[in-house]
Curated annotation (Swiss-Prot):
UniProt enzyme class: transferase
EC number: 2.1.1.195
Family indicated by similarity: Belongs to the CbiD family.
Protein name: Cobalt-precorrin-5B C(1)-methyltransferase
Pathway membership, UniProt: Cofactor biosynthesis; adenosylcobalamin biosynthesis; cob(II)yrinate a,c-diamide from sirohydrochlorin (anaerobic route): step 6/10
A Pfam family recorded for this sequence: CbiD
Catalytic activity annotation: Co-precorrin-5B + S-adenosyl-L-methionine = Co-precorrin-6A + S-adenosyl-L-homocysteine
Amino acid sequence: MWPESAESPAPLRTGLTTGTCATACCVAAAQALFADQQAASVSVTLPKGKVVDLPIIEYQTIDAGMKTSTIKDAGDDPDATHGATLFVELRLSPEQGVRFRAAQGVGIVTRTGLLLDVGEPAINPVPRKMMTEHLKGFAQTYHYQGGFDVSVGVINGEQIAQKTMNPRLGILGGLSILGTTGIVRPFSCAAYIASIHQGIDVARANGLTHIAATTGNASEDAIKSHYQLDDMALIEMGDFVGAVLKHIKKVEQADFAKLNSSTQLQTLSICGGFGKISKLAQHHMDLNSRASSIDLGALAKLAASLGADNALQERMTKANTSVEALSFAISDGLPLADAICQQALDFARQYIPAHIALEVWAIDRKGQFVGKALDADNSKRDEP
């Protein structure tokens, strides 16, 4: 079994990535082919050297090879692939090397900007390296001079992929085989954050100069309609605004250092519900309720700077929600949402290079814009 997470007083189980599962299937298939053993479980060495055991639920002889399957266990992480059946069809080949293919339920890359070339199966570099190293170990042990054809698949993967960012990223036909450490940390949301980074990379690589990062469906619909943006320009960041800001800073500054302006962004729009934007205005980079809360007193203080009297400030401080506090301010004719958007913009601005025009938009629960802040000067300066 794999270890429990130490971050929680009541330990949460860590899980294993799809890349680790695929590697286990490779190990099981190779063991069956070379040693004529069909073990109930196999051991896999993770990138940092830790060894984990995974159960193998199926062995099936195929032409020139073996098919093996395992069940993806994400531990206590809310992972879309948790419980999915992942399989590998491993075939021996007279041609040396290891070649990867997408079987049923694994996607194909159709857009530039990802870690893989267009036309490649969506099996990321670290899982490829893990599988290759384990297979080379078998080849060395058994003095095998040939190569391997590895087809990785996921039962119902095409349907599961609709719950992920893959279609928007241009990974079509199924899931991606992922992993960098081999382990899924509960609620680390590493895969989701990686998809945010990939969305930004794909948009930039395909020449888009304006992207919009949104907290949910309503904010996405609002900003998409306002600017008539292409789906590729829409980054569903959820609560992870920090992932957007930090990644844009990183990649844009890297291109600036290379004097490469061909992929640089010109405009970033951040759009979300008033409560989420209020958290950003209060310097929170994770907008989830478990990680941050709204300071109603700070909202009231901001309203005071706009002319709110003591009675209104007290009502706002005692409001049930930030949206209710906003409604009190609106009733008094105060542009609180615009002011919140401006505070959020001022905070986000420190992460976003100066050549990018920054916007922050807030919507109400009906998906209507209630506030906005735009860069006062959209002329681009010379340095990020």
